[in-house]
Amino acid sequence: HVHSFSRGATHTDVGDDNQVAEALAAVEQKEGHIDYVINTAGVLNREPLASMEYDTILKAVQTNYMGTVNVALRARPYLQRTRGKLIFFTSSSYTRGRAFYSIYSSTKAAIVNFVQAVAQEWDADGISINCINPERTKTPMRQQNFGIEPDETLLMPERVAEATLRTLLTDCTGQVIDVRRPAAGK
């Protein structure tokens, strides 16, 4: 069974450690176990750093980075019992900071380093932890920040979901899984 939590639908904020703990406990109580945890939460505020309100910066770091830490720490005991898998999401901007989204790019880079480090720490516990790195994807967050773009220039969310599911079926850990648009004509 799949359980979904979000700020909009369930008022669950990954930046709030207690809310993460409550969400995971509710799933474990209902299902008896947790095999996989996938965290896609992210905030992109596309504006110059010098123009950003400090509270906006803190909220982005709290969601993007501390949300990752919260989910990992709170999911760990459940995933230890099932030798489960944990997936986080980065962005192609993690490899090179980009003007007007310095906080987003830097928190996404931090997620990659976090995943690689924690994968080594938790390998003996049987927990796999990986990071999905989709290229520019057609999402509401993207549209909010960049407007309407031609579909052929964007990765479709379904392709990202398929790559995520394929990753759950592997034994890899500590990896960054790049997801790209299919080549023209494929």
Locate the predicted segments by residue.
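C-terminal helical subdomain
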Residues: A124, C131, T139, G147-K186
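Substrate-binding pocket helix/loop in short-chain dehydrogenase/reductase
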Residues: P48-L49, T56-V61
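Active-site helix of classical SDR
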Residues: A72, T107
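Residue(s) in the substrate-gating loop at a strand-loop-helix junction
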Residues: S91
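Active-site loop-to-helix junction immediately N-terminal to the catalytic Tyr of the SDR YXXXK motif
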Residues: M52, G97-S105, A117, N145
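Active-site-adjacent segment of SDR/Rossmann-fold oxidoreductases
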Residues: R96, A117-I127
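Conserved NAD(P)H cofactor-binding loop of Rossmann-fold oxidoreductase domains
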Residues: T40-N45
